[in-house]
Protein backbone atom coordinates (compact mmCIF):
# COMPACT_ATOMS: atom_id res chain seq x y z
CA UNK A 1 0.00 0.00 0.00
CA UNK A 2 1.33 3.40 -0.94
CA UNK A 3 0.71 6.69 0.91
CA UNK A 4 0.47 9.97 -0.95
CA UNK A 5 0.54 13.41 0.61
CA UNK A 6 -1.53 15.94 -1.21
CA UNK A 7 -1.26 19.68 -0.50
CA UNK A 8 -3.72 22.32 -1.60
CA UNK A 9 -3.48 26.07 -1.01
CA UNK A 10 -0.61 25.72 1.40
CA UNK A 11 -2.27 23.13 3.66
CA UNK A 12 -1.68 19.45 3.94
CA UNK A 13 -4.55 17.07 3.70
CA UNK A 14 -4.65 13.81 5.41
CA UNK A 15 -3.09 10.90 3.65
CA UNK A 16 -5.35 8.79 1.57
CA UNK A 17 -5.04 5.12 1.08
CA UNK A 18 -4.57 4.19 -2.56
CA UNK A 19 -5.19 0.61 -3.27
CA UNK A 20 -2.62 -0.93 -5.59
CA UNK A 21 -3.63 -2.72 -8.73
CA UNK A 22 -1.99 -5.91 -7.49
CA UNK A 23 -4.26 -6.09 -4.45
CA UNK A 24 -7.58 -7.57 -5.49
CA UNK A 25 -9.02 -7.59 -2.00
CA UNK A 26 -11.56 -5.13 -0.86
CA UNK A 27 -11.00 -2.40 1.66
CA UNK A 28 -11.45 -3.19 5.33
CA UNK A 29 -14.71 -2.16 6.92
CA UNK A 30 -15.19 0.02 9.98
CA UNK A 31 -18.08 1.30 12.00
CA UNK A 32 -19.43 4.53 10.67
CA UNK A 33 -19.92 7.47 12.99
CA UNK A 34 -22.52 9.86 11.60
CA UNK A 35 -21.34 13.40 11.19
CA UNK A 36 -23.54 16.38 12.10
CA UNK A 37 -24.22 17.01 8.43
CA UNK A 38 -25.25 13.43 7.99
CA UNK A 39 -27.61 13.36 10.96
CA UNK A 40 -29.12 16.65 9.93
CA UNK A 41 -30.44 15.15 6.73
CA UNK A 42 -34.16 14.71 6.63
CA UNK A 43 -34.12 11.10 5.64
CA UNK A 44 -37.15 9.69 3.97
CA UNK A 45 -36.44 6.12 5.16
CA UNK A 46 -35.22 4.67 8.43
CA UNK A 47 -31.49 4.35 8.54
CA UNK A 48 -31.62 0.69 9.51
CA UNK A 49 -33.56 -0.13 6.36
CA UNK A 50 -30.70 1.30 4.28
CA UNK A 51 -28.24 -0.83 6.18
CA UNK A 52 -30.31 -3.96 5.68
CA UNK A 53 -30.73 -3.17 1.96
CA UNK A 54 -26.99 -3.15 1.31
CA UNK A 55 -26.03 -6.01 3.61
CA UNK A 56 -24.35 -3.92 6.23
CA UNK A 57 -21.54 -2.55 3.94
CA UNK A 58 -20.99 -0.74 0.69
CA UNK A 59 -20.43 -3.09 -2.23
CA UNK A 60 -17.41 -2.64 -4.50
CA UNK A 61 -17.11 -3.78 -8.09
CA UNK A 62 -15.02 -6.81 -8.82
CA UNK A 63 -11.43 -6.36 -9.90
CA UNK A 64 -10.82 -6.02 -13.63
CA UNK A 65 -7.15 -6.78 -14.43
CA UNK A 66 -7.38 -5.20 -17.85
CA UNK A 67 -8.31 -1.93 -16.46
CA UNK A 68 -5.82 0.59 -15.15
CA UNK A 69 -8.37 2.28 -12.98
CA UNK A 70 -10.13 1.06 -9.95
CA UNK A 71 -13.89 1.56 -10.21
CA UNK A 72 -15.69 1.71 -6.95
CA UNK A 73 -19.30 0.87 -7.20
CA UNK A 74 -21.21 3.18 -4.90
CA UNK A 75 -24.57 2.05 -3.61
CA UNK A 76 -27.66 3.99 -4.51
CA UNK A 77 -28.36 6.04 -1.40
CA UNK A 78 -31.01 8.24 -2.91
CA UNK A 79 -33.47 9.23 -0.18
CA UNK A 80 -36.74 8.64 -1.94
CA UNK A 81 -39.95 8.34 -0.03
CA UNK A 82 -41.39 4.88 0.25
CA UNK A 83 -45.19 5.30 0.12
CA UNK A 84 -45.83 1.87 1.59
CA UNK A 85 -43.58 2.74 4.48
CA UNK A 86 -45.41 6.02 5.19
CA UNK A 87 -48.73 4.20 5.29
CA UNK A 88 -47.53 1.68 7.82
CA UNK A 89 -46.96 2.42 11.48
CA UNK A 90 -43.54 3.66 12.47
CA UNK A 91 -41.41 1.63 14.84
CA UNK A 92 -40.10 4.23 17.24
CA UNK A 93 -37.86 1.96 19.34
CA UNK A 94 -34.69 0.67 17.66
CA UNK A 95 -34.13 -3.02 17.00
CA UNK A 96 -31.46 -4.54 19.18
CA UNK A 97 -30.05 -6.48 16.23
CA UNK A 98 -29.09 -3.26 14.52
CA UNK A 99 -26.35 -2.67 17.07
CA UNK A 100 -24.03 -5.07 15.21
CA UNK A 101 -24.80 -3.73 11.73
CA UNK A 102 -22.10 -1.62 10.11
CA UNK A 103 -21.54 0.67 7.15
CA UNK A 104 -18.43 0.88 5.07
CA UNK A 105 -15.97 3.66 5.69
CA UNK A 106 -16.10 6.59 3.24
CA UNK A 107 -13.08 7.09 0.99
CA UNK A 108 -11.74 10.16 2.77
CA UNK A 109 -11.69 8.59 6.23
CA UNK A 110 -8.59 6.65 7.36
CA UNK A 111 -8.81 3.39 9.18
CA UNK A 112 -9.39 3.65 12.93
CA UNK A 113 -8.68 0.55 14.99
CA UNK A 114 -8.48 1.85 18.52
CA UNK A 115 -10.82 0.35 21.12
CA UNK A 116 -12.03 3.76 22.27
CA UNK A 117 -13.02 4.79 18.77
CA UNK A 118 -14.78 1.48 18.23
CA UNK A 119 -16.82 1.80 21.41
CA UNK A 120 -17.78 5.37 20.56
CA UNK A 121 -18.73 4.44 17.03
CA UNK A 122 -20.87 1.54 18.27
CA UNK A 123 -22.97 3.82 20.42
CA UNK A 124 -23.29 6.35 17.60
CA UNK A 125 -24.46 3.68 15.19
CA UNK A 126 -27.19 2.66 17.61
CA UNK A 127 -28.45 6.22 17.78
CA UNK A 128 -28.14 6.74 14.05
CA UNK A 129 -29.95 3.53 13.23
CA UNK A 130 -32.95 4.71 15.20
CA UNK A 131 -33.54 7.62 12.85
CA UNK A 132 -36.93 7.42 11.21
CA UNK A 133 -39.57 9.56 9.62
CA UNK A 134 -42.56 10.41 11.88
CA UNK A 135 -45.54 12.28 10.54
CA UNK A 136 -47.59 14.67 12.74
CA UNK A 137 -50.51 12.24 12.72
CA UNK A 138 -48.33 9.42 13.98
CA UNK A 139 -46.87 11.65 16.69
CA UNK A 140 -50.37 12.49 17.85
CA UNK A 141 -51.33 8.79 17.95
CA UNK A 142 -48.23 7.94 19.93
CA UNK A 143 -48.87 10.70 22.47
CA UNK A 144 -52.47 9.62 22.83
CA UNK A 145 -51.40 6.03 23.55
CA UNK A 146 -48.71 7.02 26.05
CA UNK A 147 -50.81 9.58 27.95
CA UNK A 148 -54.18 7.86 27.71
CA UNK A 149 -54.18 7.09 31.44
CA UNK A 150 -53.80 10.73 32.42
CA UNK A 151 -56.95 12.71 33.10
CA UNK A 152 -56.48 16.44 32.91
CA UNK A 153 -59.12 18.87 34.14
CA UNK A 154 -60.07 22.14 32.56
CA UNK A 155 -57.53 24.89 33.25
CA UNK A 156 -58.70 27.42 35.80
CA UNK A 157 -57.90 30.41 33.68
CA UNK A 158 -60.15 33.43 33.52
CA UNK A 159 -61.77 33.92 30.17
CA UNK A 160 -61.73 37.56 29.32
CA UNK A 161 -64.81 38.11 27.26
CA UNK A 162 -65.68 41.48 25.93
CA UNK A 163 -68.79 42.88 27.57
CA UNK A 164 -71.79 44.11 25.67
CA UNK A 165 -71.36 47.51 24.08
CA UNK A 166 -74.27 48.90 26.09
CA UNK A 167 -72.23 48.52 29.30
CA UNK A 168 -69.52 50.77 27.88
CA UNK A 169 -71.78 53.81 27.62
CA UNK A 170 -71.05 56.15 30.58
CA UNK A 171 -74.63 57.38 30.88
CA UNK A 172 -76.04 53.86 31.18
CA UNK A 173 -73.34 52.82 33.63
CA UNK A 174 -74.13 55.87 35.77
CA UNK A 175 -77.83 54.94 35.89
CA UNK A 176 -76.91 51.40 36.92
CA UNK A 177 -74.70 52.70 39.73
CA UNK A 178 -77.45 55.03 40.92
CA UNK A 179 -79.86 52.10 41.16
CA UNK A 180 -77.30 50.07 43.12
CA UNK A 181 -76.73 52.98 45.51
CA UNK A 182 -80.47 53.25 46.15
CA UNK A 183 -80.61 49.53 46.93
CA UNK A 184 -77.53 49.76 49.16
CA UNK A 185 -79.25 52.40 51.29
CA UNK A 186 -81.21 49.58 52.93
CA UNK A 187 -77.92 48.29 54.41
CA UNK A 188 -77.17 51.52 56.27
CA UNK A 189 -76.74 50.65 59.97
CA UNK A 190 -79.49 52.21 62.02
CA UNK A 191 -81.63 51.53 65.03
CA UNK A 192 -84.36 49.04 64.29
CA UNK A 193 -87.79 50.66 64.57
CA UNK A 194 -89.89 49.20 67.36
CA UNK A 195 -93.48 48.39 66.39
CA UNK A 196 -94.47 47.70 69.97
CA UNK A 197 -92.73 48.01 73.30
CA UNK A 198 -91.63 44.84 75.03
CA UNK A 199 -94.07 43.51 77.66
CA UNK A 200 -93.10 43.83 81.28
CA UNK A 201 -94.40 40.35 82.17
CA UNK A 202 -96.25 37.43 80.64
CA UNK A 203 -99.56 38.72 82.06
CA UNK A 204 -98.79 42.07 80.51
CA UNK A 205 -98.16 40.34 77.18
CA UNK A 206 -101.58 38.63 77.40
CA UNK A 207 -103.24 41.97 78.05
CA UNK A 208 -101.44 43.58 75.13
CA UNK A 209 -102.08 40.94 72.46
CA UNK A 210 -105.17 39.18 73.86
CA UNK A 211 -103.94 35.97 72.27
CA UNK A 212 -102.03 33.27 74.10
CA UNK A 213 -99.82 32.23 71.20
CA UNK A 214 -98.84 35.77 70.25
CA UNK A 215 -98.33 36.62 73.93
CA UNK A 216 -95.90 33.71 74.39
CA UNK A 217 -93.99 34.70 71.29
CA UNK A 218 -93.70 38.34 72.37
CA UNK A 219 -92.64 37.44 75.89
CA UNK A 220 -90.02 34.99 74.59
CA UNK A 221 -88.61 37.66 72.28
CA UNK A 222 -88.44 40.11 75.18
CA UNK A 223 -86.50 37.59 77.27
CA UNK A 224 -84.00 37.05 74.47
CA UNK A 225 -83.40 40.79 74.21
CA UNK A 226 -82.62 40.94 77.90
CA UNK A 227 -80.18 38.01 77.70
CA UNK A 228 -78.90 38.00 74.11
CA UNK A 229 -76.97 34.89 73.02
CA UNK A 230 -73.29 35.15 72.28
CA UNK A 231 -72.92 35.21 68.53
CA UNK A 232 -69.56 35.09 66.82
CA UNK A 233 -68.56 37.93 64.57
CA UNK A 234 -69.17 37.17 60.92
CA UNK A 235 -67.14 38.99 58.36
CA UNK A 236 -69.40 40.22 55.61
CA UNK A 237 -68.52 40.36 51.99
CA UNK A 238 -67.65 43.50 50.16
CA UNK A 239 -70.49 45.70 49.07
CA UNK A 240 -71.95 45.95 45.59
CA UNK A 241 -70.10 49.17 44.84
CA UNK A 242 -66.78 47.43 45.48
CA UNK A 243 -67.67 44.81 42.86
CA UNK A 244 -68.66 47.51 40.39
CA UNK A 245 -65.27 49.16 40.79
CA UNK A 246 -63.54 45.92 39.78
CA UNK A 247 -65.27 45.60 36.38
CA UNK A 248 -63.10 47.90 34.29
CA UNK A 249 -61.67 51.40 34.25
CA UNK A 250 -64.91 53.02 33.06
CA UNK A 251 -66.93 51.45 35.89
CA UNK A 252 -64.21 52.44 38.35
CA UNK A 253 -64.31 56.09 37.32
CA UNK A 254 -68.11 56.20 37.40
CA UNK A 255 -68.42 54.39 40.75
CA UNK A 256 -65.76 56.29 42.67
CA UNK A 257 -67.78 59.52 43.18
CA UNK A 258 -70.75 57.51 44.48
CA UNK A 259 -68.51 55.63 46.88
CA UNK A 260 -67.90 58.75 48.99
CA UNK A 261 -71.49 60.00 48.93
CA UNK A 262 -72.62 57.66 51.70
CA UNK A 263 -70.11 56.78 54.42
CA UNK A 264 -71.32 54.43 57.13
CA UNK A 265 -69.24 52.28 59.46
CA UNK A 266 -70.06 49.80 62.18
CA UNK A 267 -66.58 48.32 62.53
CA UNK A 268 -63.73 50.10 64.29
CA UNK A 269 -61.16 48.37 62.09
CA UNK A 270 -62.84 49.51 58.88
CA UNK A 271 -63.12 53.06 60.15
CA UNK A 272 -59.43 53.14 61.12
CA UNK A 273 -58.48 51.91 57.65
CA UNK A 274 -60.68 54.60 56.14
CA UNK A 275 -58.90 57.26 58.18
CA UNK A 276 -55.53 55.97 57.03
CA UNK A 277 -56.42 55.91 53.34
CA UNK A 278 -58.19 59.27 53.47
CA UNK A 279 -54.95 60.92 54.58
CA UNK A 280 -52.98 59.29 51.78
CA UNK A 281 -55.30 60.40 48.99
CA UNK A 282 -55.77 63.88 47.63
CA UNK A 283 -59.42 63.41 46.70
CA UNK A 284 -61.88 65.63 48.56
CA UNK A 285 -64.90 63.83 50.02
CA UNK A 286 -68.32 65.48 50.05
CA UNK A 287 -70.66 62.85 51.49
CA UNK A 288 -74.38 63.23 51.99
CA UNK A 289 -74.48 60.55 54.73
CA UNK A 290 -71.95 60.00 57.48
CA UNK A 291 -72.94 57.34 60.01
CA UNK A 292 -70.97 55.70 62.81
CA UNK A 293 -72.80 52.85 64.53
CA UNK A 294 -71.71 51.71 68.00
CA UNK A 295 -68.03 52.59 67.69
CA UNK A 296 -67.15 52.80 71.38
CA UNK A 297 -63.38 52.90 70.79
CA UNK A 298 -63.35 55.83 68.38
CA UNK A 299 -62.11 59.02 70.03
CA UNK A 300 -62.35 62.71 69.19
CA UNK A 301 -58.82 62.91 67.68
CA UNK A 302 -59.86 60.24 65.20
CA UNK A 303 -62.73 62.41 63.98
CA UNK A 304 -60.45 65.43 63.75
CA UNK A 305 -58.28 63.50 61.27
CA UNK A 306 -61.02 63.75 58.64
CA UNK A 307 -59.45 66.86 57.20
CA UNK A 308 -60.39 66.06 53.61
CA UNK A 309 -64.09 65.65 54.29
CA UNK A 310 -66.27 68.62 53.46
CA UNK A 311 -69.80 68.89 54.84
CA UNK A 312 -71.49 71.18 52.33
CA UNK A 313 -73.67 68.32 51.05
CA UNK A 314 -74.12 66.51 54.36
CA UNK A 315 -77.78 65.71 55.07
CA UNK A 316 -77.56 62.83 57.54
CA UNK A 317 -75.09 62.86 60.44
CA UNK A 318 -75.34 60.09 63.01
CA UNK A 319 -73.08 59.00 65.86
CA UNK A 320 -75.19 56.20 67.30
CA UNK A 321 -73.90 55.15 70.73
CA UNK A 322 -70.46 56.65 70.15
CA UNK A 323 -69.97 58.18 73.62
CA UNK A 324 -66.49 59.62 73.02
CA UNK A 325 -67.01 61.71 69.91
CA UNK A 326 -69.01 64.75 68.80
CA UNK A 327 -69.11 66.61 65.48
CA UNK A 328 -66.01 68.84 65.26
CA UNK A 329 -66.50 72.58 65.52
CA UNK A 330 -64.88 73.00 62.11
CA UNK A 331 -67.90 71.30 60.55
CA UNK A 332 -70.48 73.71 61.94
CA UNK A 333 -70.12 76.38 59.27
CA UNK A 334 -70.88 73.88 56.48
CA UNK A 335 -73.97 72.13 57.88
CA UNK A 336 -76.60 74.28 56.23
CA UNK A 337 -78.07 71.29 54.35
CA UNK A 338 -78.17 69.01 57.38
CA UNK A 339 -81.63 67.47 57.87
CA UNK A 340 -81.03 64.56 60.24
CA UNK A 341 -78.86 64.63 63.36
CA UNK A 342 -78.77 61.59 65.65
CA UNK A 343 -76.38 61.61 68.63
CA UNK A 344 -77.89 59.44 71.40
CA UNK A 345 -76.10 58.45 74.59
CA UNK A 346 -73.43 61.15 74.47
CA UNK A 347 -72.43 62.98 77.64
CA UNK A 348 -70.30 65.46 75.69
CA UNK A 349 -73.42 67.12 74.26
CA UNK A 350 -74.45 70.09 76.41
CA UNK A 351 -76.23 73.43 76.09
CA UNK A 352 -73.17 75.26 74.76
CA UNK A 353 -72.73 72.69 72.03
CA UNK A 354 -76.40 73.01 70.98
CA UNK A 355 -76.18 76.81 71.10
CA UNK A 356 -73.33 76.90 68.58
CA UNK A 357 -74.72 74.06 66.48
CA UNK A 358 -78.27 75.42 66.21
CA UNK A 359 -77.07 78.53 64.38
CA UNK A 360 -75.71 76.40 61.49
CA UNK A 361 -78.58 73.95 60.92
CA UNK A 362 -81.62 75.92 59.75
CA UNK A 363 -82.93 73.00 57.66
CA UNK A 364 -82.83 70.42 60.43
CA UNK A 365 -85.88 68.12 60.47
CA UNK A 366 -84.92 65.22 62.76
CA UNK A 367 -83.04 65.58 66.02
CA UNK A 368 -82.44 62.71 68.44
CA UNK A 369 -80.64 63.53 71.69
CA UNK A 370 -81.88 60.59 73.69
CA UNK A 371 -79.92 59.85 76.87
CA UNK A 372 -77.85 63.05 76.52
CA UNK A 373 -78.10 63.82 80.22
CA UNK A 374 -76.25 67.16 80.15
CA UNK A 375 -78.78 68.95 77.92
CA UNK A 376 -81.26 71.24 79.67
CA UNK A 377 -84.09 73.59 78.69
CA UNK A 378 -81.63 76.20 77.41
CA UNK A 379 -80.29 73.93 74.70
CA UNK A 380 -83.78 72.79 73.63
CA UNK A 381 -85.01 76.39 73.39
CA UNK A 382 -82.04 77.24 71.13
CA UNK A 383 -82.96 74.36 68.84
CA UNK A 384 -86.62 75.43 68.75
CA UNK A 385 -85.73 79.02 67.88
CA UNK A 386 -83.24 78.21 65.09
CA UNK A 387 -84.80 75.07 63.56
CA UNK A 388 -88.33 75.95 62.45
CA UNK A 389 -88.56 72.93 60.09
CA UNK A 390 -88.14 70.43 62.90
CA UNK A 391 -90.46 67.39 62.60
CA UNK A 392 -88.94 64.87 65.01
CA UNK A 393 -87.51 65.64 68.44
CA UNK A 394 -86.55 63.07 71.06
CA UNK A 395 -84.81 63.98 74.28
CA UNK A 396 -86.03 61.13 76.46
CA UNK A 397 -83.80 60.01 79.30
CA UNK A 398 -83.58 57.89 82.41
CA UNK A 399 -81.45 60.24 84.51
CA UNK A 400 -81.48 63.93 85.35
CA UNK A 401 -85.00 64.39 84.07
CA UNK A 402 -85.36 67.56 86.11
CA UNK A 403 -83.22 69.44 83.54
CA UNK A 404 -85.99 69.19 80.93
CA UNK A 405 -89.32 70.74 81.92
CA UNK A 406 -92.47 72.06 80.28
CA UNK A 407 -90.48 75.07 79.04
CA UNK A 408 -88.86 72.92 76.35
CA UNK A 409 -92.19 71.36 75.34
CA UNK A 410 -93.92 74.74 75.03
CA UNK A 411 -91.00 76.17 73.01
CA UNK A 412 -91.26 73.32 70.52
CA UNK A 413 -95.01 73.80 70.24
CA UNK A 414 -94.65 77.53 69.67
CA UNK A 415 -91.74 77.75 67.21
CA UNK A 416 -91.95 74.44 65.31
CA UNK A 417 -94.51 72.09 63.80
CA UNK A 418 -93.06 68.98 65.34
CA UNK A 419 -94.90 65.71 64.65
CA UNK A 420 -92.99 63.18 66.76
CA UNK A 421 -92.24 64.22 70.33
CA UNK A 422 -90.29 62.21 72.90
CA UNK A 423 -90.06 63.55 76.46
CA UNK A 424 -89.80 60.27 78.34
CA UNK A 425 -88.43 60.69 81.86
CA UNK A 426 -88.68 64.51 81.84
CA UNK A 427 -90.42 66.79 84.33
CA UNK A 428 -93.32 67.79 82.09
CA UNK A 429 -96.44 68.81 84.03
CA UNK A 430 -100.14 69.20 83.20
CA UNK A 431 -99.87 72.91 82.34
CA UNK A 432 -97.12 72.23 79.81
CA UNK A 433 -99.18 69.50 78.09
CA UNK A 434 -102.22 71.78 77.90
CA UNK A 435 -100.22 74.59 76.32
CA UNK A 436 -98.46 72.29 73.89
CA UNK A 437 -101.79 70.77 72.78
CA UNK A 438 -103.16 74.25 72.18
CA UNK A 439 -100.16 75.37 70.13
CA UNK A 440 -99.31 72.25 68.11
CA UNK A 441 -101.77 69.47 69.02
CA UNK A 442 -103.16 69.14 65.49
CA UNK A 443 -99.72 68.22 64.05
CA UNK A 444 -98.71 65.60 66.62
CA UNK A 445 -98.71 62.01 65.36
CA UNK A 446 -96.60 60.30 68.01
CA UNK A 447 -96.31 61.34 71.66
CA UNK A 448 -94.04 59.62 74.17
CA UNK A 449 -94.51 60.61 77.81
CA UNK A 450 -93.22 57.52 79.59
CA UNK A 451 -92.12 58.02 83.20
CA UNK A 452 -93.26 61.66 83.33
CA UNK A 453 -94.01 61.55 87.02
CA UNK A 454 -95.76 64.97 87.19
CA UNK A 455 -98.65 64.14 84.85
CA UNK A 456 -102.07 63.49 86.42
CA UNK A 457 -105.68 62.83 85.41
CA UNK A 458 -106.19 66.56 84.79
CA UNK A 459 -104.15 66.63 81.60
CA UNK A 460 -104.08 63.70 79.19
CA UNK A 461 -107.51 62.11 79.90
CA UNK A 462 -109.29 65.42 79.50
CA UNK A 463 -107.30 66.37 76.40
CA UNK A 464 -108.34 63.10 74.80
CA UNK A 465 -111.95 63.73 75.68
CA UNK A 466 -111.66 67.09 73.90
CA UNK A 467 -109.90 65.51 70.90
CA UNK A 468 -106.95 67.86 71.25
CA UNK A 469 -104.72 65.45 69.28
CA UNK A 470 -106.86 64.55 66.25
CA UNK A 471 -104.02 63.00 64.19
CA UNK A 472 -102.40 61.05 67.01
CA UNK A 473 -101.49 57.46 66.08
CA UNK A 474 -99.19 56.32 68.92
CA UNK A 475 -99.37 57.27 72.60
CA UNK A 476 -96.82 56.00 75.12
CA UNK A 477 -97.87 56.39 78.75
CA UNK A 478 -95.87 53.85 80.69
CA UNK A 479 -95.08 54.29 84.37
CA UNK A 480 -97.41 57.25 84.96
CA UNK A 481 -98.31 56.57 88.56
CA UNK A 482 -100.77 59.47 88.87
CA UNK A 483 -102.93 58.40 85.91
CA UNK A 484 -105.94 56.42 87.13
CA UNK A 485 -108.82 57.54 84.93
CA UNK A 486 -108.66 55.78 81.58
CA UNK A 487 -112.29 56.09 80.47
CA UNK A 488 -111.56 58.79 77.94
CA UNK A 489 -108.65 56.80 76.53
CA UNK A 490 -110.97 53.86 75.86
CA UNK A 491 -113.75 55.96 74.36
CA UNK A 492 -111.28 57.82 72.16
CA UNK A 493 -109.76 54.54 70.94
CA UNK A 494 -113.17 53.00 70.17
CA UNK A 495 -114.15 56.11 68.28
CA UNK A 496 -110.93 55.94 66.23
CA UNK A 497 -111.58 52.28 65.43
CA UNK A 498 -114.99 53.17 64.09
CA UNK A 499 -113.24 55.59 61.71
CA UNK A 500 -110.71 52.92 60.61
CA UNK A 501 -107.94 54.94 62.23
CA UNK A 502 -107.17 53.11 65.49
CA UNK A 503 -104.67 54.49 67.96
CA UNK A 504 -101.93 52.41 69.57
CA UNK A 505 -101.64 53.01 73.31
CA UNK A 506 -98.41 51.66 74.79
CA UNK A 507 -98.94 51.50 78.55
CA UNK A 508 -97.44 49.72 81.52
CA UNK A 509 -99.03 46.63 83.02
CA UNK A 510 -101.07 48.60 85.54
CA UNK A 511 -102.57 51.03 83.03
CA UNK A 512 -103.11 48.21 80.52
CA UNK A 513 -105.21 46.34 83.10
CA UNK A 514 -107.24 49.47 83.75
CA UNK A 515 -107.81 49.94 80.03
CA UNK A 516 -108.83 46.30 79.61
CA UNK A 517 -111.29 46.48 82.48
CA UNK A 518 -112.73 49.71 81.14
CA UNK A 519 -113.13 48.21 77.67
CA UNK A 520 -115.04 45.24 79.10
CA UNK A 521 -117.25 47.57 81.14
CA UNK A 522 -117.99 49.74 78.11
CA UNK A 523 -118.80 46.66 76.04
CA UNK A 524 -121.21 45.41 78.71
CA UNK A 525 -122.90 48.78 78.91
CA UNK A 526 -123.20 48.91 75.12
CA UNK A 527 -124.67 45.41 75.11
CA UNK A 528 -127.23 46.32 77.77
CA UNK A 529 -128.17 49.46 75.91
CA UNK A 530 -128.56 47.50 72.69
CA UNK A 531 -130.67 44.85 74.45
CA UNK A 532 -132.86 47.52 75.99
CA UNK A 533 -133.40 49.19 72.64
CA UNK A 534 -134.22 45.90 70.94
CA UNK A 535 -136.69 44.98 73.71
CA UNK A 536 -138.38 48.33 73.39
CA UNK A 537 -138.61 47.89 69.65
CA UNK A 538 -140.10 44.40 69.90
CA UNK A 539 -142.68 45.43 72.51
CA UNK A 540 -143.63 48.52 70.56
CA UNK A 541 -145.99 46.48 68.30
CA UNK A 542 -147.94 45.10 71.27
CA UNK A 543 -148.44 48.56 72.69
CA UNK A 544 -149.69 49.80 69.34
CA UNK A 545 -152.21 46.94 69.09
CA UNK A 546 -153.46 47.55 72.65
CA UNK A 547 -153.95 51.20 71.89
CA UNK A 548 -155.90 50.32 68.74
CA UNK A 549 -158.19 47.97 70.68
From Swiss-Prot:
* UniProt KW Glycosyltransferase keyword: no
| Residue segments, region Disordered | 1-39
Question: What SUPFAM superfamilies does this protein map onto?
Answer: RNI-like
Q: Does the keyword Nucleotide-binding apply?
A: no
A GO term, aspect molecular function: small GTPase binding
The GO biological-process annotations, alphabetized, read as: cell division; mitotic spindle assembly checkpoint signaling; mitotic spindle orientation checkpoint signaling; negative regulation of exit from mitosis; negative regulation of septum digestion after cytokinesis; protein-containing complex disassembly; SCF-dependent proteasomal ubiquitin-dependent protein catabolic process
Q: Which residues form the signal peptide?
A: none
Location within or outside the cell: Cytoplasm; Nucleus
Q: Which GO terms describe its cellular component?
A: cellular bud; cytoplasm; nucleus
Q: What induces it, per record? A: Expressed in daughter cells after execution of mitotic exit. Expression is controlled by the ACE2 and SWI5 transcription factors.
| Keywords, in A-Z order | Cell cycle, Cell division, Cytoplasm, Mitosis, Nucleus
- Subunit structure and binding partners: Interacts with TEM1.
Q: Which family does it belong to?
A: Belongs to the AMN1 family.
Other remarks on this protein: Present with 2020 molecules/cell in log phase SD medium.
User: Which purpose does this protein serve, as stated in its record?
Assistant: Negative regulator of the mitotic exit network (MEN), required for multiple cell cycle checkpoints. Acts in the daughter cell to inhibit the mitotic exit pathway once MEN has executed its function. Through its binding ability to TEM1, interferes with the TEM1-CDC5 association, required for CDC5 kinase activation and MEN activation. Required for daughter cell separation and chromosome stability. Involved in copper sensitivity.
This protein's name? Antagonist of mitotic exit network protein 1
Species annotation: Saccharomyces cerevisiae (strain ATCC 204508 / S288c)
Amino acid sequence: MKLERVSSNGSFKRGRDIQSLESPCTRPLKKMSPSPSFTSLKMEKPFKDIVRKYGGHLHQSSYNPGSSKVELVRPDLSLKTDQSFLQSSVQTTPNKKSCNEYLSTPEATPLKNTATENAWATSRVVSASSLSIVTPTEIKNILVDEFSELKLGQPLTAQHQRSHAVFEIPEIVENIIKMIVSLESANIPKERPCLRRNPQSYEHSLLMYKDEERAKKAWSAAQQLRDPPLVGHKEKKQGALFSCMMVNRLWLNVTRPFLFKSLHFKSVHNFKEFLRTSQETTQVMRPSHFILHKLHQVTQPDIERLSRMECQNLKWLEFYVCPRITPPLSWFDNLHKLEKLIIPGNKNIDDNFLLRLSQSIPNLKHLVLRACDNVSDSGVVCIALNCPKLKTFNIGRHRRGNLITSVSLVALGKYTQVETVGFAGCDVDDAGIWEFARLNGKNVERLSLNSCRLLTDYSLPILFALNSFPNLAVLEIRNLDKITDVRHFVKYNLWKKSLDAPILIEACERITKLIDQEENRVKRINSLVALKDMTAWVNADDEIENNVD
